[in-house]
Amino acid sequence: MRAEQVSIGGIPAILYGDSAERGYLFLHGQMGRKEEAEAFALAACPRGHQVLSIDLPGHGARQGRDEELAPWTAVPDIRTALDWAERRWESISLRATSIGAYFAMLAFANPARALLLSPVLDMEGLILTMMS
């Protein structure tokens, strides 16, 4: 399977698979990195999709940069990746985990499909539980 390292507006990313009309944006969770998409890409690419995976702020190749993982930093990056994907694919789906799923729901209006693994659906509730 083809895997190409790309930079999207300074955001480190990997594009998996051959050229296709459909794609998935893959977003990792807390402490994750873009390379986690490889196993998913091995299943999705033979079915006619490409998979684009980015490093969220402070993760993967972005560790050591003075970036925080917060909605005001992650959501604009996800929208930048979506803009990039919209220029290449007719249909964009989402595969996201945990906090990546939460940020995706803030950034992504109408994915063709959404595959969410352990999504954070109630951020306020999560924070209150962690603080008690």
Question: What are these regions, as identified by a protein language model?
Answer:
Residues 1-18:
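N-terminal cap/lid segment of alpha/beta-hydrolase-fold proteins
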Residues 21-29:
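Short beta-strand element of the alpha/beta-hydrolase
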Residues 30-42:
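The serine-hydrolase catalytic nucleophile loop
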Residues 36, 68-87:
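Alpha/beta-hydrolase active-site loop
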Residues 41-63:
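Conserved alpha/beta-hydrolase
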Residues 95-104:
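Gly/Ala-rich beta-loop-alpha elbow adjacent to hydrolase catalytic centers
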Residues 109-132:
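Hydrolase active-site cap/lid region
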